[in-house]
Each structure stands twice: as C-alpha cells, then as structure tokens.
Regions:
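Bacterial N-terminal signal peptides that target proteins for export
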Residues: 2-13
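Residue-level signal for mature regions of secreted extracellular proteins and peptides
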Residues: 17-18
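C-terminal motif of bacterial Sec signal peptides marking the signal peptidase cleavage site
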Residues: 22-23
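Short, conserved catalytic or interaction motifs in soluble domains
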Residues: 26
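Short coil/linker segments at helix-helix boundaries
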Residues: 36-64, 71-74, 85-185, 194-228, ...
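Conserved small-residue-rich beta-alpha loop and adjacent elements
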Residues: 191
Length: 293
C-alpha cells in the first residue's frame, strides 16, 4: 500500500505539469482562434460613424487584447493590433485634451510594436543603435516585418512629437525615419500609404535649415492622396497642420481644412471612423488659424 502511495506521489508532479501545460496550450489556442474575429472587429470599428461609441468601446477592446497577450505573449498578430489600437485611441480621442496621457499611450504602442518587430527576427533597438547599425539591421527586413516596422516607427514618431523637449528626440526621429524608409522600399502603399504621410510630416514640419524639404513633403502627400483616391481626409489634415503651417501658407491651410469639414460623411465608408476623427481635428485646427498666421 505504501509503495502504491509513493508511486502516486511520484506521478503527481508530472500530472500537474501536464495539466499546466495543457492550460497554457489551451489559452494560446483560444487566442489564436480569435484572430479572424479580431480582423472583423477592426473592420467594423473602422466603419463606425459614431465617434462617442468608438471612444467608449476602444479601452475595453485594448484591455482584451492585452489580456490575450498574457496568454500568448509571442503572438505577433495580437501585438500589432495592440500597437494599432493604442495609436488610434491616443490620436483619435486623447491627444487634443491630454497630451501627457496620449504620450503614455504612444509609448505603450511603441513597446508592443517593437516586441512584434523583434519577434519577426529583426533585433532592432531604435533608441540605442547608431543610425548605421539600425539601417543595417532593418535592411534585412522582408515583407513579414513591414507591419511591425510601420507601427514601431509611427508610435516612436508620435511619442517624439509630444516630447520635443527630450534631448534624444533628434536622434530618435532619425531612427523612426530609417525604419519607415524600409517600409517605403518594401510596400509603399501599406496601411493607406502611411509611410508617405509620415515623410510628408517628417520633411514638411521643419524649416529647410533644420532638415526640412517642402517639395519632397508635398510629393509624399500627393502620393498618399493618390493611394487613397483622395478619400482619406487625414492626408489633407496632416498637410495643413505641418506643411502649410511651416510654409505660412494660410490660404492652403484654410482651403484644406475647409474641404475636410465640408466632405460628405460617406466619402470613404471603409474608413469612416478616421475620417470622422479627422473632421473633428480640422474644426479644432481652424480655431487656431489666427494664432498661427
């Protein structure tokens, strides 16, 4: 009897380990099984026309994604949705009213995106690598790393934009540009031509003596508009806010923002949410016109 009891005791750790492994595997299976649902959820959110409904829904969605990442921390797909979600929530609903909080969300966005990038095999660290080191590292990136490169660069760029007094900002924005340049090389129309919008802001938001290139910025905005058949209002918003303001082109600033405000709500049904957010921000920028010009 004692021998049987000892045998059971010896088996117990193995049984417990098996149960724990099964639980972990089950958690991962559940997460991976929701990936197609997440695709549909994001598509539905992008089509949302009620900004208040979207604002109230997004925090719960983000926490759900982060909960799934606890179950499956190596899930690159979910990492990228977390990055995209935090970026969208910060840009769409937080930045104009609380820049510090938005900055924290962009940082979380960056952390998720960088982890996703490293999980694709690109062991980059944009904040510590020299430009030459980073360029060599991202030069190895292929198509599977495009999304992670894009969101890492985008989130880092927005974090820098809200923390311009940070001494490392100039170095880090060049790191974001190196990553985004690789996105341009691999797939320049990825995420609605987002890389072109990035470089429109990058070259358009600075005076030429500080590295700006307004002609190049205008070309990038033109390409982004063409990719979206002039239906994504965000392109005009960014051109007005950064390039027109930097060039002191009040007429262009007003014309672009007025076009946004007057655009029909059904201009781009697949991207109704971002167009609605863009309209809201355009109204805000128009209130600043007299101060800026």
């Amino acid at each position: 009897m004692q021998t049987i009891r000892h045998t059971h005791l010896k088996l117990l750790p193995g049984i417990l380990a098996t149960l724990l492994l099964s639980a972990c595997s089950m958690g991962k299976m559940v997460v991976q099984g929701t990936e197609s649902v997440m695709d549909s959820s994001v598509e539905t959110m992008n089509r949302e026309t009620d900004l208040e409904l979207a604002r109230e829904a997004m925090p719960a969605n983000l926490k759900l994604i982060e909960g799934m990442l606890i179950e499956d921390p190596g899930n690159t797909f979910m990492r990228l949705y977390a990055a995209e979600g935090f970026y969208g929530y910060a840009f769409g609903f937080i930045e104009l009213e609380d820049r510090e909080r938005a900055s924290q969300f962009y940082r979380r966005c960056y952390d998720h995106a960088l982890r996703a990038l490293q999980d694709t095999g690109i062991q980059a660290n944009p904040e510590t690598s020299s430009p030459a080191e980073l360029e060599a590292t991202v030069g190895k990136a292929g198509a599977k790393s495009v999304a992670a490169l894009f969101w890492t660069a985008s989130c880092l760029g927005k974090w820098i934009d809200l923390n311009r007094d940070e001494p490392t900002g100039i170095i880090e924005i060049s790191s974001a540009a190196i990553m985004m340049q690789r996105v341009l090389e691999l797939d320049d129309d990825f995420y609605y031509g987002g890389a072109h919008m990035f470089f429109g802001v990058y070259y358009g938001g600075r005076a030429p003596m500080f590295g700006g290139d307004h002609a190049l910025a205008e070309e990038h905005f033109r390409k982004a508009a063409a990719i979206n058949q002039d239906r994504l209002l965000l392109v005009d918003l960014l051109q007005a806010e950064y390039l027109d303001r930097q060039r002191l082109d009040q007429a262009g600033f007003n014309k672009r923002l007025t076009r946004i405000v007057e655009a029909p709500d059904d201009l781009y049904p697949e991207m109704a949410l971002i167009n609605g957010i863009t309209k809201q921000r355009a109204h805000h920028l128009l209130t600043l016109e007299d101060d800026w010009f």
